[in-house]
Curated annotation (Swiss-Prot):
Name recorded for this polypeptide: Forkhead box protein J1
Pfam families from the UniProt entry: Forkhead
Keywords: Activator, Cilium biogenesis/degradation, DNA-binding, Nucleus, Transcription, Transcription regulation
Protein's job: Transcription factor specifically required for the formation of motile cilia. Acts by activating transcription of genes that mediate assembly of motile cilia, such as CFAP157. Binds the DNA consensus sequences 5'-HWDTGTTTGTTTA-3' or 5'-KTTTGTTGTTKTW-3' (where H is not G, W is A or T, D is not C, and K is G or T). Activates the transcription of a variety of ciliary proteins in the developing brain and lung.
GO molecular function: DNA-binding transcription activator activity, RNA polymerase II-specific; RNA polymerase II cis-regulatory region sequence-specific DNA binding
Subcellular locations according to the entry: Nucleus
Tissue expression: Predominantly expressed in tissues containing motile cilia.
GO terms of biological process kind: actin cytoskeleton organization; axoneme assembly; brain development; cell maturation; central tolerance induction; ciliary basal body organization; cilium assembly; determination of left/right symmetry
Keyword Ion transport applies: no
UniProt main location, coarse: nucleus
Membrane spanning residue stretches: none
Knockout mutant characteristics: Mice lack motile respiratory tract cilia and exhibit randomization of the left-right body axis due to loss of motile cilia in the embryonic node. Motile type cilia with a '9 + 2' microtubule ultrastructure are absent in epithelial cells, including those in the airways.
DNA-binding region: 120-210
Length: 421
């Protein structure tokens, strides 16, 4: 140890000892610390155990067996990494490297013999296995032990697998409604009950079990294949684009009621029929409408409610104008103040309706007429003075008291001024 330290210290400041005692330049040492080229060229099989310094010991005992790498390395401790080449660009982890030996590889599903192959699990559910065992027994009822025996005899996987699959068989028998437990008779030998298939689900369960048994697990079930190959018109529900005769009749009645009917006397009131149906109508009928559930009497009562509620057709025929003309006899009180009377917009579907004449002029015209009336009253008062002799009114003198003589004189002066005007 001391000799190696002295040998390292004996090298100059510009030199450094290499891994094999050689001398390297400082620049080369810096490049080796920052470069990752060694990682791509690294291989576990080619890696050698580090050499111990002279006089050193191996406290952990890693190098007692030659040719083995320290188990502290995660990749070296994995036996799956032995024999696997490590090339740049194709990393191999310890999880993906764990695979069965070549002799234990699973064969293709089409070539599997479940009776002799112990490495491939059958692609059947536990309920299907139970059903297959009951059907193979040719008896109306079967014991649990007989089900176990049939499964192990026909599937080699369950002979070598963990016996926990038997718990799954028992759970399926107890919880699945397709199986019924039959109690043992008193005079029958043995113990434990029997199991059989419920007749309500027997046909469906047996057909599904043996169809799966004949075909490999990767194939499509025959029932689904036949359903997919059928044409849409052959479907029992008629397909998404086919409409039965009853639905077509209902659709025709609906078009006649909405497209050609009117309010009460449709043709007499509106003057014409609709020539085009509604632009958006659904021709697909997925379920019968609610009108099928009504009796003929109820449908007769609902017939007067059918009508055309198209506002555009109503305004084209001028029906609203006739309705508004009937309002001319009504007297509408003007607003309390001119400010509260705003513009009334009677535009419906882009058509403007003029205000009735009884509604009165706008606020500005009413204000102008009010000013004109006040001016007219003032001028008429000046143009037509009081005629004391011609009028039957009493003279103003007796009305006023004795102290108001001056006021009566002033009134007479105003009357004389008005005569000149």
């Amino acid at each position: 140890m001391a000799e190696s330290w002295l040998r390292l210290c004996g090298a100059g400041p510009g030199e450094e000892a290499g891994p094999e005692g050689g001398m390297e330049e400082p620049d080369a040492l810096d490049d080796s610390l920052t470069s990752l080229q060694w990682l791509q060229e690294f291989s576990i099989l080619n890696a050698k155990a580090p050499t111990l310094p002279p006089g050193g010991t191996d406290p952990h005992g890693y190098h007692q067996v030659p040719g083995l790498v320290a188990p502290g390395s995660p990749l070296a401790a994995d036996p799956a990494c032995l024999g696997q080449p490590h090339t740049p660009g194709k990393p191999t982890s310890s999880c993906t490297s764990r695979s069965a030996p070549p002799g234990l590889q699973a064969p293709p599903p089409d070539d599997v013999d479940y009776a002799t192959n112990p490495h491939v699990k059958p692609p059947y559910s536990y309920a299907t296995l139970i059903c297959m065992a009951m059907q193979a027994s040719k008896a109306t009822k079967i014991t649990l032990s007989a089900i176990y025996k049939w499964i192990t005899d026909n599937f080699c996987y369950f002979r070598h697998a963990d016996p926990t699959w038997q718990n799954s068989i028992r759970h399926n028998l107890s919880l699945n409604k397709c199986f019924i437990k039959v109690p043992r008779e008193k005079d029958e030998p043995g113990k434990g009950g029997f199991w059989r298939i419920d007749p309500q689900y027997a046909e469906r369960l047996l057909s599904g079990a043996f169809k799966k048994r004949r075909l490999p697990p990767v194939h499509i079930h025959p029932a689904f294949a036949r359903q997919a190959s059928q044409e849409p018109s052959a479907a029992p529900w008629g397909g998404p684009l086919t409409v039965n005769r009853e639905a077509q009749q209902l659709l025709q009645e609906f078009e006649e009621a909405t497209g050609e009917g009117g309010w009460g006397t449709g043709e007499g009131r509106l003057g014409h029929k609709r020539k085009q149906p509604l632009p958006k109508r659904v021709a697909k009928v997925l379920r019968p409408p609610s009108t099928l559930l009504l009796t003929q009497e109820e449908q007769g009562e609902l017939e007067p409610l059918k009508g055309n509620f198209d506002w555009e057709a109503i305004f084209e025929a001028g029906a609203l104008g006739e309705e508004l003309s009937s309002l001319e006899g009504l007297e509408l009180s003007p607003p309390l103040s001119p400010s509260s009377h705003g513009d009334v917009d009677l535009t419906v579907h882009g058509r403007h309706i003029n205000c009735p004449a009884t509604w009165g002029p706008p606020a500005e015209q009413a204000a102008d007429s009010l000013d004109f009336d006040e001016t007219f009253l003032a001028t008429s008062f000046l143009q037509h003075p009081w005629d004391e002799s011609g009028s039957g009114c009493l003279p103003p003198e007796p009305i006023f008291e004795a102290g108001d003589a001056t006021l009566a004189a002033d009134l007479q002066d105003w009357a004389s001024v008005g005569a000149f005007l």
